[in-house]
Amino acid sequence: MIFSVDKVRADFPVLSREVNGLPLAYLDSAASAQKPSQVIDAEAEFYRHGYAAVHRGIHTLSAQATEKMENVRKRASLFINARSAEELVFVRGTTEGINLVANSWGNSNVRAGDNIIISQMEHHANIVPWQMLCARVGAELRVIPLNPDGTLQLETLPTLFDEKTRLLAITHVSNVLGTENPLAEMITLAHQHGAKVLVDGAQAVMHHPVDVQALDCDFYVFSGHKLYGPTGIGILYVKEALLQEMPPWEGGGSMIATVSLSEGTTWTKAPWRFEAGTPNTGGIIGLGAALEYVSALGLNNIAEYEQNLMHYALSQLESVPDLTLYGPQNRLGVIAFNLGKHHAYDVGSFLDNYGIAVRTGHHCAMPLMAYYNVPAMCRASLAMYNTHEEVDRLVTGLQRIHRLLG
């Protein structure tokens, strides 16, 4: 299949609108991606003609809704090449998936004196749950430091592991710098020390294929809304043997086998014991449509187009005076920058006036901001529906802001 950005853009209704009298250039997909009509229509159709509560319903609508939900679990397992669909838990998103691991596996396996390793480039969602766990049990949080070019100081990693290391929690791709970490060697090293590995894949799965079996990670988590799917839905992958050992972290309906006031409660098997309550079935249906949409385009095709666009963007941005870029030359998805000494908020506001949507702030990565000694950055993210023309508009906009503000 030949990738056509024009055909892709035609599937996204929002891309035809104007902002401040100008065509929208949406360069904020790393925060949340726009949704194609196929996803919007699939979710709407479910609510119009197929909605019912899932699990245990004997009527047709309930049975069909349950089947559709479980088919999405199967589709998602194929998307990341899991061994079994029963290794996948539906969660609200990456943040909940990481918290689930911290509160279920973490509470059962991390003790006083143990340690967990993260990196200085992590999103707060892959920092705070581990800080909370370490504070609860008296464990130590160790940090892989950054290099100025936005890569990790991997030479320090062997010195951080010891016999008390229980987990390496690492991002696949930095949400600020676009750095893709060398997971294979990091995971191998962790396993050599008897540690488990959790990968935050929120910024990776939309850019190229992910194979959890090849990676050999123990946990992999991502969100639907960054993958052109709905908000409020995500996937947590856990190796089957680990998942079956993990206790539930939330109680309620759908996750039990039996409930007795005198004899207590027993749990149903994984993954369903981690899905208490009524699930976001509409969101799950929408996620399935997003996975189908991206798979039909071909992630390798998407990767090739996006990499060419990224190379073009980095080349063109060299023409902007006083522009500071953060991160390595080889990157995925995002370009973080500051213009002179102007605050990122001001630069982003000017760009919005030109119809260009970028993200400004600390990007839920305050330790990374502290490393670069800045309060905030602008971040332009490139998705499969962005164009060379939109990159040109960004460059022209930044040049114009530089002339106006000096």
From Swiss-Prot:
The modification N6-(pyridoxal phosphate)lysine is found at residue 226. Its cofactor is pyridoxal 5'-phosphate. Keywords: Cytoplasm, Hydrolase, Lyase, Pyridoxal phosphate, Transferase. One of its GO terms (molecular function) is pyridoxal phosphate binding. InterPro entries: Aminotrans_V_dom, Aminotrans_V_PyrdxlP_BS, Cys_dSase_SufS, PyrdxlP-dep_Trfase, PyrdxlP-dep_Trfase_major, PyrdxlP-dep_Trfase_small. The active site is at residue 364. SUPFAM superfamilies: PLP-dependent transferases. Displays a strong preference for selenocysteine as a substrate in vitro and is only very slightly active using cysteine. The interactions with SufE and the SufBCD complex act synergistically to enhance, up to 50-fold, its cysteine desulfurase activity. It catalyses: (sulfur carrier)-H + L-cysteine = (sulfur carrier)-SH + L-alanine; L-selenocysteine + AH2 = hydrogenselenide + L-alanine + A + H(+); 3-sulfino-L-alanine + H2O = sulfite + L-alanine + H(+). PROSITE patterns: AA_TRANSFER_CLASS_5 (PS00595). CDD domains: SufS_like. Its EC number is 2.8.1.7, 3.13.1.-, 4.4.1.16. Its main location: cytoplasm. It is found in: Cytoplasm. Induction: Suf operon is under both the Fe-dependent Fur repressor and the oxidative stress dependent OxyR activator. Pathway: Cofactor biosynthesis; iron-sulfur cluster biosynthesis. HAMAP family: SufS_aminotrans_5. Cysteine desulfurases mobilize the sulfur from L-cysteine to yield L-alanine, an essential step in sulfur metabolism for biosynthesis of a variety of sulfur-containing biomolecules. Component of the suf operon, which is activated and required under specific conditions such as oxidative stress and iron limitation. Acts as a potent selenocysteine lyase in vitro, that mobilizes selenium from L-selenocysteine. Selenocysteine lyase activity is however unsure in vivo. Can also desulfinate L-cysteine sulfinate (3-sulfino-L-alanine). Homodimer. Interacts with SufE and the SufBCD complex composed of SufB, SufC and SufD. The interaction with SufE is required to mediate the direct transfer of the sulfur atom from the S-sulfanylcysteine. This is Cysteine desulfurase. The gene is sufS.
